[in-house]
Amino acid sequence: MAAILAIAACAIHAQQKPTVLRVGYFPNITHAQALVGRANGQFEKALGAGVQVEWKAFNAGPSAIEALFANAIDLTYVGPNPTVAGYFRSQGEAVRVIAGAASGGASLVVRKDAGIRNASDFHGKKVATPQLGNTQDVALRSWMRANGLKAREKGGDVQVIPISNPDQLTLFLKGQLDAAWAPEPWAARLVHEGGGRVFLDERDLWPDHQFVITNLIVSPKFLKDHPDVVKSFLRTHVELTEWIDNNQAQAKQIMNQQLQKETSKPLPQEVLDDAFSRMQVTYDPIRSSLLKSTQQAFDEGFLGRTKPDLSGLYDLTLLNEVLREKKARPVQ
């Protein structure tokens, strides 16, 4: 009898053990849903006591993808180019896009005293991106190609320097960088704190000023094993997207409080307002823009010799279930 009771107790304990959901994100306002949701505990409330959420912050996309490969995270907010690179490297086994998160929110910022007025002035300059192969890195290299510029490693004279966003600001202030292609709020910080100006708002390069800068992706294994958890997370993601869009002043205040926790100080209000003016939260993954950025990454040599087949990259089934339940238009 004692043995039976012990076995039963173990079974009950096993049933009560919470599912752990490890979520990646960046301390950027282009990851607004993660910042607001983490600050107010909305994901934890929606998922309930049966799910334990663990948050993991990254500087740029490739690091988040490596964590996904290493089974260190289950789901992450991340840019389109690392998403595609991860899908390609894993032969479609490690990545599924389940929603969009943000559109816009990236700019090419130049130092006011760097002598840059047009594209040809970038010859011989030092230009930073957050990380080799990340979304802004690919965008810069593609723009350079379109304007007759080449990086040093490809026989040109533009020095492209992959360096973290905080270090970009430091080097800007020291006059050791001429420009940077950066996501928000770092682009706005380079303007307001680093003596820079926006040379190019990336939205101007895209149809209808719409391009995906942040996706929500998941491990296919976690999606298969825990579809209920993923759907609940998506429902909250959609609700946060709608709330942020309709309550921008309050949302910016919450994001700033969370950014203070992440980066040790809040953003000045003018920086936050400027940064938010160049982006839009959305749960639409804007698939067409990802396909174009994939072509750009392929052209820049980040995806090998064979262009990847992305037919299995998206799984919007649960997102569209949530949208139908909310009587909202499904996305494609």
Give short role names for the model-derived ranges.
Residues 16-162, 174, 178-184, 199:
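Short, glycine-/small- and polar/acidic-enriched structural segments
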Residues 295-332:
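Conserved C-terminal helix/tail region of periplasmic/extracytoplasmic solute-binding proteins
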Residues 30, 39, 64, 79-82, ...:
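Stable alpha-helical elements in mature extracytoplasmic
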Residues 224-305:
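Secondary-structure end/capping motifs
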Residues 41-51, 204-207, 276-285:
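Short, solvent-exposed loop/beta-turn-alpha elements that line the ligand-binding surface or hinge
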